């Protein structure tokens, strides 16, 4: 038994001196593994005289239990030390200056569009959406565009090889809406539209919002009242407005809306902001609505145009150049 005691004392000292989990595992295998020294002592019990086996077995079991407990304790100590070291390395010094996150903001065109939609929602209009890739029927034919109309030309419209096109206005959404709903109708459609045009006040892609009302007793006076209320609500002040006769294939009569806009030098000039009119009877017939019973009005505006006026931007292209210095002004 003195041999077992001596082996145990040396083994406990080695366990206490182990500095890594790998060293500790190697000691466990050397002591308690299938070929370990303690296991070898158990295998030799059968060679001892019968009167010594019990005492020797008890001593070996006590040694094994002591070593197992020591190994577990040392393993826990090493793991705790490793965790403490890792946490110390990852510790955040709360006294150091923080890194401020960049504050995001909505694009001025998005802010303008949301404001317009909110105003018309208060007036009872439902927002509807439609595809940006349209067919000739929804973009032109159903809206009373004659075959020879210049808007159908390649130099004004982006066509695909199969005859489809990038919508030139959101009016196609109105056609789809009238196909799917019965009067009375109060709807607006907003989104990207595409035209082959690019200069200081035009872009090949821009945002448009159009509105439509169809009911049994709608009049041009209702249209004027609606647009007057919208302009007042958007700019938060009253404007002198005028409605000039104009031609659009899908309305009759048609008009363009001007507001008396004050210049930086204090002078006032008429500024076009909207197109509108009473829905043409042919458009109503094309969607199965009886023009003898129902009338309606429609209107449309360029969202970028209203954004330019609201924020004092002179060049439309600034909205699409993604210059953070410019956009941050509106965040």
Swiss-Prot record:
Identify which top EC class this enzyme belongs to: ligase
Name the EC number(s): 6.1.1.20
Task: Tell me its family.
Answer: Belongs to the class-II aminoacyl-tRNA synthetase family. Phe-tRNA synthetase alpha subunit type 1 subfamily.
* PROSITE patterns reported for this sequence: AA_TRNA_LIGASE_II (PS50862)
UniProt xrefs under InterPro entries? aa-tRNA-synth_II (IPR006195), aa-tRNA-synth_II/BPL/LPL (IPR045864), Phe-tRNA_ligase_II_N (IPR004188), Phe_tRNA_ligase_alpha1_bac (IPR022911), Phenylalanyl-tRNA_Synthase (IPR002319), tRNA-bd_arm (IPR010978)
Q: What keywords would UniProt list here?
A: Aminoacyl-tRNA synthetase, ATP-binding, Cytoplasm, Ligase, Magnesium, Metal-binding, Nucleotide-binding, Protein biosynthesis
Q: Which reactions fall under this protein's catalytic activity?
A: tRNA(Phe) + L-phenylalanine + ATP = L-phenylalanyl-tRNA(Phe) + AMP + diphosphate + H(+)
Q: What are the subcellular locations of this protein?
A: Cytoplasm
What is said about its interaction partners and assembly? Tetramer of two alpha and two beta subunits.
GO MF terms listed in the record are: ATP binding; magnesium ion binding; phenylalanine-tRNA ligase activity; tRNA binding
Q: Which GO terms describe its cellular component?
A: cytoplasm
- Residues binding Mg(2+): 252
The name of this protein is: Phenylalanine--tRNA ligase alpha subunit
Transmembrane feature ranges:
none
One GO biological-process annotation of the entry reads:
phenylalanyl-tRNA aminoacylation
The protein's matches in Gene3D superfamilies, at most eight in alphabetical order, are given as:
Bira Bifunctional Protein, Domain 2 (3.30.930.10)
**What does the record give as cofactor?**
Mg(2+)
Q: How is the cofactor bound?
A: Binds 2 magnesium ions per tetramer.
Q: Which Pfam families match?
A: Phe_tRNA-synt_N, tRNA-synt_2d
Q: Which domain of life is it from?
A: Bacteria
């Amino acid at each position: 038994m003195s041999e077992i005691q001596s082996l145990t004392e040396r083994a406990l000292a080695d366990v206490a001196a182990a500095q890594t989990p790998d060293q500790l595992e190697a000691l466990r295998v050397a002591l308690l593994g299938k070929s370990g020294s303690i296991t070898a002592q158990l295998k030799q019990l059968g060679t001892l005289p019968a009167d010594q086996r019990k005492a020797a077995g008890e001593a070996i079991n006590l040694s094994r239990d002591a070593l197992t407990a020591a190994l577990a304790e040392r393993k826990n100590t090493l793991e705790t030390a490793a965790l403490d070291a890792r946490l110390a390395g990852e510790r955040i010094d709360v006294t150091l200056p923080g890194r401020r996150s960049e504050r995001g903001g909505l694009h001025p065109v998005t802010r303008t569009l949301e404001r317009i939609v909110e105003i018309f929602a208060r007036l009872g209009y439902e927002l509807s959406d439609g595809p940006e890739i349209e067919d000739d029927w929804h973009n032109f034919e159903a809206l009373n565009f004659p075959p020879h109309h210049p808007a159908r030309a390649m130099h004004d419209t982006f066509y695909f090889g199969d005859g489809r096109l990038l919508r030139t206005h959101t009016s196609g959404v109105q056609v789809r809406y009238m196909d799917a709903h019965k009067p009375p109708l109060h709807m607006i459609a907003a989104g990207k539209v595409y035209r082959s045009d690019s200069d200081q006040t035009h872009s090949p892609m821009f945002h448009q919002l159009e509105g439509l009302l169809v009911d049994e007793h709608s009049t041009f006076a209702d249209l004027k009242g609606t647009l007057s209320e919208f302009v007042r609500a958007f700019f938060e002040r009253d404007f002198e407005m005028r409605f000039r006769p104009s031609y659009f294939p899908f309305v009759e009569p048609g008009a363009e809306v001007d507001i008396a806009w004050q210049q930086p030098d204090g002078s006032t000039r008429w500024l076009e902001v909207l197109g509108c009119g009473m829905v043409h009877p042919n458009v109503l017939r094309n969607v199965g609505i009886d023009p003898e019973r129902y009338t309606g009005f429609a209107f449309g505006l360029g969202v970028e145009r209203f954004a330019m006026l609201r924020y004092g931007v002179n060049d439309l292209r600034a909205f699409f150049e993604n210059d953070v210095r410019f956009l941050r002004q509106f965040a």
